[in-house]
């Protein structure tokens, strides 16, 4: 319990994010590098405009001859974090709130992960700065779905660590449920591959964290049960996005084409 408590030192990542995003707030500008400017912002703006008109953004008539907008996972219209676009602010302001909120979430979740592994408070804050504001994550402002998944990744890893611990049925249920919810948020945020990578990480973490005495570790059968339960919860919560995307993908050119696109 002590390790999960917040520290005043977390003001440091908050102030760092404020220093980065502050000038954008003052000038009313958005970073439009690469995919953000020509894909994500127009897509999110279209969704924002339809919601403001009281129309569910299920179909887009702006691409090709029309396409199922809700089936495009990168649109992430079912992601709960999109409630930030319902704030009584301009689209640009809502977009900045969305970006800065996920940067802050990445820092907080990294802090929690580091503390769970026994890192000191100052070390956990340093870890949160290194990950949340490091180049690999910070540059994802131009590829927003990956920023969203990166913000939830540390929490997912910490929950994987928890389900690997021997515990009673009551104690083991919570992290399994929380992991399922977190995986669903990653999928709904637009990056289903990250959720798959987290699941693939579970047996690896189990292997590297196995105790010297096998009897004190969690049995493989119980680990399989917990992993399966978490995946089922994630699928149930993210099915509203997964099923339309899967159905739409069946009519895509990659599905229809019989040969590989590459020369290999």
Feature-to-residue mapping (PLM):
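Membrane-embedded helix bundles of polyisoprenyl
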Residues: 13-14, 107-117, 121-211, 226-245
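Membrane-interface coil-to-helix junctions
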Residues: 16-110, 129-154, 261-264
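Conserved, charged catalytic cores of large soluble enzymes
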Residues: 205, 210-214, 243-262
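Membrane-interfacial, low-structure loops and terminal tails that flank and connect transmembrane helices
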Residues: 1, 167-171, 212-222
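Start-transfer (signal-anchor) and selected internal transmembrane alpha helices
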Residues: 1-23, 218-227, 231
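Hydrophobic alpha-helical transmembrane segments of integral membrane proteins
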Residues: 5, 9-10, 19-20, 76, ...
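Hydrophobic residues in alpha-helical segments
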Residues: 25, 50-52, 163-168, 211-215
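Membrane-water interface of alpha-helical transmembrane segments
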Residues: 3-10, 82, 92, 96-99, ...
């Amino acid at each position: 319990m002590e390790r999960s408590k917040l520290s005043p030192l977390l003001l440091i990542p908050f102030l760092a994010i404020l220093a980065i995003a502050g000038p954008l707030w003052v000038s009313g500008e958005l970073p439009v590098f690469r995919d953000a400017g020509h894909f994500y912002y127009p897509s999110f703006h279209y969704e924002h405009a339809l919601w403001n008109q009281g129309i569910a953004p299920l179909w887009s008539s702006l691409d090709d001859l029309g396409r199922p907008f809700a089936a495009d996972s990168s649109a992430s219209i079912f992601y709960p974090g999109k409630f930030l676009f319902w704030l009584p602010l301009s689209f640009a302001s809502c977009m900045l709130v969305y970006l800065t909120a996920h940067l802050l979430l990445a820092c907080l979740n990294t802090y929690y992960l580091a503390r769970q592994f026994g890192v000191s408070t100052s070390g956990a804050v340093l870890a949160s700065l290194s990950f949340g504001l490091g180049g690999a994550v910070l540059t994802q402002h131009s590829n927003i779905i990956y920023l969203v998944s990166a913000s939830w990744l540390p929490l997912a890893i910490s929950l994987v660590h928890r389900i690997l611990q021997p515990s009673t049925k009551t104690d083991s249920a919570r992290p399994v449920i929380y992991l399922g919810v977190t995986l669903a948020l990653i999928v709904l945020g637009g990056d289903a591959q990250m959720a798959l990578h987290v699941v693939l990480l579970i047996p690896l973490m189990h292997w590297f964290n196995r105790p010297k005495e096998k009897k004190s570790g969690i049995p493989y059968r119980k680990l399989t049960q917990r992993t399966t339960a978490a995946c089922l919860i994630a699928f149930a919560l993210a099915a509203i996005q997964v099923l339309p995307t899967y159905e739409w993908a069946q009519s895509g050119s990659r599905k229809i084409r019989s040969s590989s696109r590459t020369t290999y």
